[in-house]
Amino acid sequence: ALLRQTFLDAQWYKTKPAAEGLNLSLQSWNDNQGLPQIFEANDKWNNLRADRIGDEFGVQYIIKSGENEYQRIKEMKSTNATFIVPLNYPAAQDVEDPNDARFVSLNDMKHWELAPANAAAFEKAGIPFCLTTADLRSVNQFWTNLRKAMEYGLSENKVLEALTKTPATTLGIYDKVGSLDAGKWANFLITNGSLFDAKSAIQYNYVQGNKYVIKDDNFIAGTYNVTINTPSGDEKYTLDVKSTSSVTMFGKDTLNTKFSQDGKVVKLS
């Protein structure tokens, strides 16, 4: 009701009523109507309410969703909105105690099971969406929850699009960011594997062309096969490197060895 009244007041103020004089709040409201507008709805039904009031006053909102839109995905499609989708999933129900388990509803258990499929439902329905760290108990959960969403059907290509092109397009700044093209800001990551592989690490982060080292690629942690030439013949070892100063060699005997590293050259001792 308050939002609707503000829209009506702003429309009235456009007529420049003499009795009102200068109203900086309504003037600013009218001046900013051309900007992208985000409505934090956080629920499937609130999404539809936000869209209805937007339709009433000619505004296409960008809607910040919740985690239950998969339950009414056709209605979400009908809004023609771009959504901002969080990756915050409900915690598992505590059913260890049979007395507590009696009060856990089937709806809650189904939502716990299906919430990670929310983003995949948007992709399947052809609804444009971005991904956000909003609502997470810790931003450190983002990659774990993102990988879980991919296990539930969200494609790698759509993830990249939802983190880059779609946000930039939605905010009207795709001419500056959102892809690696000549003339755009050089904002990108370099990893030692697939960005979505839990074992991969971010090595460099480029921000507007400036390089920031996250993990130096000179660190050679890993497992290696080594052949040593000796007068009695070749000896084969497996090297397990876990730190920058020590290595374990496995062969006929297990040896704890120290090593030093100079760039790409390693010396064992």
Region locations from a protein language model:
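Tryptophan-anchored aromatic micro-motifs
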Residues: 217-238, 245-253, 259
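Structural motif
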Residues: 40-43, 64-67, 134, 227-230
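Glycine-enriched alpha-helix->loop->beta-strand junction motifs that scaffold or abut catalytic
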Residues: 54-60, 77-84, 126-128
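C-terminal cap of metal-dependent C-N hydrolases
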Residues: 185-217
